[in-house]
Amino acid sequence: MTNTNDLGFTILSLVVFLPAVGAIILAFMRGQRGAARIFALGWSTLVFAVSLPILFNFKHDAAGLQFYEYFNWIPDWGVRYELGLDGISLWLVLLTTFVTPLAIWSAWNVEEKTNNFLMLILLQEMGMLGVFLAQDLFLFYIFWEFTLIPMYFLIGMWGGKRRIYATVKFFLYTFAASVFMLIGIIALGLLNYKYLAQQGLPTDTAFQVQTLMANINQFGLSDTELKLLFLSFFVAFAVKVPLWPVHTWLPDAHVEAPTAGSVILAAVLLKMGGYGMIRFCVQLFPQIAQEWARPIALLAVIGIIYGAVLSYAQSDIKKLVAYSSVSHMGFIVLGIFALNEVGLQGAVLQMINHGLSTGALFLLIGMVYERTHTRELADYGGLWKVVPVFVYFLLFATMASVGLPGLNGFVGEFLIMLGAFDSPIGWTFTAFAAVGVILAAVYLLKMFQGIASGPFSERRTPHLSDLTRREVAILLPLCILMLVIGLYSSYFTRPMETTIKALEAFVANAAPLIAGQ
Amino acid sequence: MNDLTFITPEINWTVLGMPAFLMIWAMLVLIVDMFTSDRRVLLTLSLIGLGVTAALGALDYGSTISGFSDMLVFDKFGVLVNWILLAGTALTLLIAFDYMPRQNLSQGEFYPLVLFATSGMLFLVQSTDLVTIFIGVETLSIALYVLTGFAVPQFKSGEAAIKYLLLGGFAAGFLVYGIALIYGMTGKTNLAQIANELSTWQSTGKALDDPILLAGVGFVLIALGFKVSMFPFHAWTPDVYEGAPTPVTAYMSVATKGAAFAAMLRFLNVAFPALKPEWQLLFGLFAAATMAYGNIVAVAQTNLKRMLAYSSIAHAGYMLLGVLAASEKGISAFTVYLLAYTLTNLGAFAVLIALENRGMPVFELSDLRGLGKRSPLLALAMTVFMFSLAGVPPTAGFASKFGIFRAAWDANLDYLAIIGVVTSVISAFFYLRVIVTMWMRDTEATEPQPTYATASLSLGVIVAVIGIIAVGILPNIFTDLAKALVLTVAP
């Protein structure tokens, strides 16, 4: 394997495959539930620790891929094993390694088939890290589809009452959308292969994203063909994000998933869609992205409003937060298709923010559900007096999610709207998005109020006890990060600045398509 | 007396080696069977025979030798497909080993019969002449008719055998008639010579779309299409698959298909490249219909054997894409697909065998309930098989589908590639249902049903799982081997 970083070892491969090693070790720890839990927590923390050198050795001024490593995997097809990372994927990788130990720790109460549960979470981590790091379309697709398998079992085996319906819907919805991306990948790889062979260049990089970015204009594709290719990728990512109107798998999956599953789903899995839009839709098809920025922004804005309204209408707390994800992820798509530095920065930052705050909300709901076994908002009330520590954390996460200045959500949403306003998307859409911010305050405060204030009913919410030390320890790192991002956002935007500036320039300089060419 | 000399025909043992050795070995096993009733001896002997046959292919691997007046050929493609068929046969014997006596089918003839069938397949794969193709098809079919009815005290097995025999007889009739028509028009039976003859037609301005020639080609393809259960010649498949003893079903679903497809590949690409636009169009429609029909009807099945039967029809459609691509990429993708499908389908049937009780011919989906709790390893293996059949990474099923769609797209059969991925999604629905049933639904039965994961069967399942993951993660090993497969065009 060829390695280009200064660390002297292939750190990205190590980070990607360490979780899988942990999962294999767990397979040999059957029957030792307690030990397995501690091992999984320790191992995922180790993965996080191993991923930290990436942050500390990341060169802020370099626009291209860093820590680049590759070997010729399937030379006959032009497929390489290639991992690399830039300012866009840096924080998403760290978010994944950061959230996974917390999710594992939150699953302390999973009594049934504990080992399998923990193994699946580690495998899920591997798949997600692979998605953020793969720089070859074939490799990317393998990781992309692989992430379906652990989540499918997590929801299907440890989920709620309608878990089978939810998990099959989740799998088929995403699988159906992804196979069109496969066609797109095959078409691009073949075109590139032919082009490289024609130019007398080595064909082993036919599926490489960088080579494709450089060559795609030389393939002689017509406007329609480019648009179809763009769509084949976009649909897969839109379902994952999820963008209105292909969001319907999300509420079902979220509501039925076990807490740790919901956390991973909300915090990381959805971000794969946003990441894919930037990495593939925008980088490979800058002209189409520009041309279709407004229609896509329209879908995003509809999603923002629609998600918000539906969220307000929910009586189930988990469903309420699930629909709030639809609304919040709309902002991210809006930021991406602003296609300027500010918007893209806001979108990437907001992916992290949403991961932290919604992850925390799902954790909190899971914690209270474990005690009361009800998620009906109507059953709750007056928790201020009974479980104050829980309510403090709930207030904090709610405020972060609403976008209170000083906390993380505000920075991201502000940047996105600034970017969208300043782009061809224009002020009308931005104004509607701003309405979404207000609505977010309405439905999230409705939820908070319903839980925290009002009369307390011992009958409907029995056995309430305040958060344990373990639960506080899970939530604290999330909340600290929300505050830090809110106050020192520049530390987080700084590493992605160079990459995003380069991307903005790349999109702006993309040769405009001549109709009928 | 000196003027009477017996001229021995020139026998090229390299060319004939694989099928001939296996045939002779099968007869030996048949004789040994008369003196011993120890199944272990028969199994061991059979496996040794398969191993030696595979080794015979390795001796001259890479060289292309034609023999017997160019009626048979020894080339990379032939050897590669033969290896896959031999591996499939070995797996079949392993998973059948404990099943047959459990079903009271302890006749030792089972082993030589399977070897006879395989020998016919190897012969078919190496055939480059219409006559040898016919011999190959018949050799394998006759052994298979007997094997289908092997559980003959069971009503369904007898029914399946008769059905297969009657329809197979029709197909053989079509084959002979087609051969006769082609011979009548071109005066040749050798595939390469037919191609030469047709190119002389072209140079002299004689029309290629002669109705009698086209009918001949069509009849041969009907017969081969029957063997691979291509729509609309698939109707026998579900009934025969359901009725035959499960290991035989498993064997038929992979080996027969593989051999017949290999023959189809040679027939179309070597003899009729001149008619390529015609057969690509016509068979493109058949391939699309096969993929769609197999997958859509499989959704409605509750009987597992029938579901796998329809799924095997669908997979024939995918393999057909590799045949139709008619390119180096297509041939290479076809062999990878055949390997992946062989491992996966045999594995899936092996799990069914492990669950099949005596006298319980019908196998319902609901019987899999709670398998994840009862025998998690078996359920895990079945999960791998189902994901591989659906084509989900990182399994062999995905890598091979990728290769097939890539070859199809490259050959401008883009509409087939798109139909292929759409039908893959449909297939995911019913493969997932198996997984859901195993892991997420509990059994209603009060007493646990036994499972028969014996040593030999487990070995077969483990080999299949490891093979699937290996081909899925490192397809390069096999694509390197299957690289630059060019079908021999002898003079």
From Swiss-Prot, chain B:
PANTHER family per the UniProt record, alphabetical: NADH DEHYDROGENASE
Similarity remark: Belongs to the complex I subunit 2 family.
InterPro entries (UniProt xref): NADH-Q_OxRdtase_suN/2, ND/Mrp_TM
Domain of life: Bacteria
Role: NDH-1 shuttles electrons from NADH, via FMN and iron-sulfur (Fe-S) centers, to quinones in the respiratory chain. The immediate electron acceptor for the enzyme in this species is believed to be ubiquinone. Couples the redox reaction to proton translocation (for every two electrons transferred, four hydrogen ions are translocated across the cytoplasmic membrane), and thus conserves the redox energy in a proton gradient.
Keywords, ordered alphabetically: Cell membrane, Membrane, NAD, Quinone, Translocase, Transmembrane, Transmembrane helix, Transport, Ubiquinone
Statement: the UniProt record of this protein carries the keyword Oxidoreductase: no
Keyword Metal-binding: no
Gene name in the database record: nuoN1
Name this polypeptide is given: NADH-quinone oxidoreductase subunit N 1
Main location: membrane
E.C. number: 7.1.1.-
Compartments where found: Cell membrane
Top enzyme class: translocase
Catalytic reaction annotation: a quinone + NADH + 5 H(+)(in) = a quinol + NAD(+) + 4 H(+)(out)
An annotated GO BP: ATP synthesis coupled electron transport
Annotated organism of origin: Herpetosiphon aurantiacus (strain ATCC 23779 / DSM 785 / 114-95)
